[in-house]
Amino acid sequence: MKRKSERRSAWATAPPCSRRSSSSSPGVKKSRSSTPQELHRLEQQDDLYLDITDRLCFAILYSRPKSATNEHYFSIDNELEYENFYADFGPLNLAMVYRYCCKINKKLKSITMLRKKIIHFTGTDQRKQANAAFLVGCYMVIYLGRTPEDAYRTLIFGDTAYIPFRDAAYGSCSFYITLLDCFHAVKKAMQYGFFNFNSFNLDEYEHYEKAENGDFNWIIPERFLAFCGPHSRSRLESGYHQHSPETYIPYFKNHNVTTIIRLNKRMYDAKRFTDAGFDHHDLFFPDGSTPAESIVQEFLDICENVKGAIAVHCKAGLGRTGTLIGCYLMKHYRMTAAESIAWLRICRPGSVIGPQQQFLVMKQSSLWLEGDYFRQKLRGQENGPLREAFSKHLSDADDLSLNGLENQDNQEPEPYSDDDEVSGMTQGDRLRALKSRRQPKASAIPLTCPLAVLTSALCSVAIWWIVCDYILPTLLFCLDGFRTQ
């Protein structure tokens, strides 16, 4: 193993994306079932440096770096942290992406760092490695104009690997989204105008995502808002915050929300929204399940004929809500199922759970064709060449179940009644309770506030002492001199 000074010298002269302390592989992943001997071997792995630009570098380090005159190291591992429900660990939300990008831009523009290499480093925790790489990749896509593939290739140089992201369900996971899925989602969201960091309202996002402040997020600004289900009255019950319809009405009216779609059992009277001037629709299906085809088509039909924004909720506003909004994203923006899930989770962590993920994968091709036909129809080409393929695909899809097996009864499921959702704790209840119990974490900015106040107070005292002990007596002496003349 080379010494730190030798490693820095070697890094400074090495070609881009290959700056390692030696030829061994630093990107080997730790398994959760690793033996102590394997862990000891992995701890001896060498550091990895990946050049992003001539001044920006991403590093995976197996020991904390020391400062240098020509390098500035920083880490966000303990600053921008994902708030998990169960075993989920990412991706980080849109506010954290914004904070990270602002941090990078500030460092690159800092006068005191103009001659320094900016090195974002992460440690040995695989989950934090994945989230750190996610942030770096997002910066490359958003600010450096890289394609998702280019950003991903930069990060997986050599044998470097990152664990994929999983859902917020309790227990095992059978579906994952990758960094590349996330980068594609961010790229398409940029292209379609889903976010713009030049006008992004960080305070609003971080305020309203909290359970106590309404627990809602925009998925598509001015079009789709996902929120947790309102109750008959506002209170703290069973460990989570409950909000009445009246809690949301002022914000909805100020942001042109015209339609409410409820996917869960009736916890409030819809008249409280309709009397306030909103349209309200009920499309019930069981918590944690996937919607029937009739539910999907009715949801899409409502959304395609609504003027203004649409607020969608189930119990927690995560599973059922994310699933149907995901269907809309696939039909009208031709996002893949994985990209739709990735974008939903970047906007609203925890969205789309369990079998709902495979459901979206199954629906992808048919919804793409529906979207193609929809756009063709709008252009006055109702009898165009896509019609035949579209009709054939729908007839084929009707013969398949979620698992790809033949549908034996060929019958549409009965419409779901809210009586089917029992009064006991369901998945949505548990997720809401977990979110409500989260303790607010101090970010890097609030942590500096006490220091700023203390510094300001000390400066004030020092100035007052200088004025009173030196300047003021001098002025009084001069004034006395003028009086004696």
Swiss-Prot record:
Region called A, residue ranges: 44-198
Described purpose of this protein according to its UniProt entry: Dual-specificity phosphatase involved in DNA damage response. Essential regulator of the G2 DNA damage checkpoint: following DNA damage, translocates to the nucleus and dephosphorylates FZR1/CDH1, a key activator of the anaphase promoting complex/cyclosome (APC/C). Dephosphorylates SIRT2 around early anaphase. Dephosphorylation of FZR1/CDH1 activates the APC/C, leading to the ubiquitination of PLK1, preventing entry into mitosis. Preferentially dephosphorylates proteins modified by proline-directed kinases.
Domain Tyrosine-protein phosphatase: 215-374
Active site per the UniProt annotation: C314 (phosphocysteine intermediate)
Short motif Nucleolar localization signal, span: 1-54
Name recorded for this polypeptide: Dual specificity protein phosphatase CDC14B
Record lineage: Eukaryota, Metazoa, Chordata, Craniata, Vertebrata
Region (Disordered): 1-38, 402-424
Record's compositionally biased regions (Low complexity): 15-28
Annotated organism of origin: Mus musculus (Mouse)
PANTHER family: TYROSINE SPECIFIC PROTEIN PHOSPHATASE AND DUAL SPECIFICITY PROTEIN PHOSPHATASE
